[in-house]
Swiss-Prot record:
Alphabetical list of CDD domains matching this protein: Ribosomal_S15p_S13e
Subunit structure: Part of the 30S ribosomal subunit.
UniProt cross-references to Pfam families, sorted A to Z: Ribosomal_S13_N (PF08069), Ribosomal_S15 (PF00312)
Protein name (record): Small ribosomal subunit protein uS15
GO MF annotation terms: small ribosomal subunit rRNA binding; structural constituent of ribosome
Family membership noted in the UniProt record: Belongs to the universal ribosomal protein uS15 family.
Taxonomic lineage of the native organism: Archaea, Methanobacteriati, Thermoplasmatota, Thermoplasmata, Thermoplasmatales
NCBIfam families, sorted: PRK08561.1
Membrane spanning stretches: none
Gene: rps15
GO cellular component: cytosolic small ribosomal subunit
This protein's record includes keyword Ribonucleoprotein: yes
């Protein structure tokens, strides 16, 4: 499938193996894994960073076969889910960096175009999240950007 704002094709990548039962090498109980997730989230880590740390340091390939629930559901149970979805938050930070660069380099037209593409991607995501009720209908991007 093609990329959104370019004529290039997408990148191929490895797919995660579908595992339905708990792997035998995991030495942590369900409660210990949930405590690790909550602790990492309270340290300020995002969901993807938590998943990477669980995979690389604790040899837990995913929370679904182990806990029978997704990582976001564990965070939702403990009221630690962020108000803004992670992918939208990353786009907002990218846009802020691009605008900071543009304020210092006013004639950088390539970066101006990239900032426009980031903004259109953010607006598309916001429409989707409002439609699926992940964001409230009165949520405003302007409040976040200032």
């Amino acid at each position: 499938m093609a990329r959104m704002h370019t004529r290039k094709r997408g990148r191929s990548g490895s797919k995660r193996i579908e595992v339905r039962e708990r792997p035998s090498w995991i030495q942590y109980s369900d409660d210990e894994i949930k405590e690790m997730i909550v602790k990492m989230r309270k340290q300020g880590m995002t969901k993807s960073m938590i998943g990477i740390r669980l995979r690389d340091q604790y040899a837990i390939p995913g929370t679904r076969p182990v806990l029978h629930m997704k990582l976001g559901q564990v965070l939702k149970e403990n009221n630690l889910e962020s108000d803004v979805p992670e992918d939208l938050q990353a786009l907002i930070e990218r846009y802020k960096r691009a605008m900071k660069h543009l304020s210092l380099n006013k004639h950088d037209m390539n970066n101006k175009r990239k900032a426009q593409l980031i903004m259109s991607k953010m607006l598309r995501l916001i429409r989707y999240y409002k439609r699926t009720s992940r964001l409230p209908q009165d949520w405003s991007l302007e409040r976040v950007l200032q």
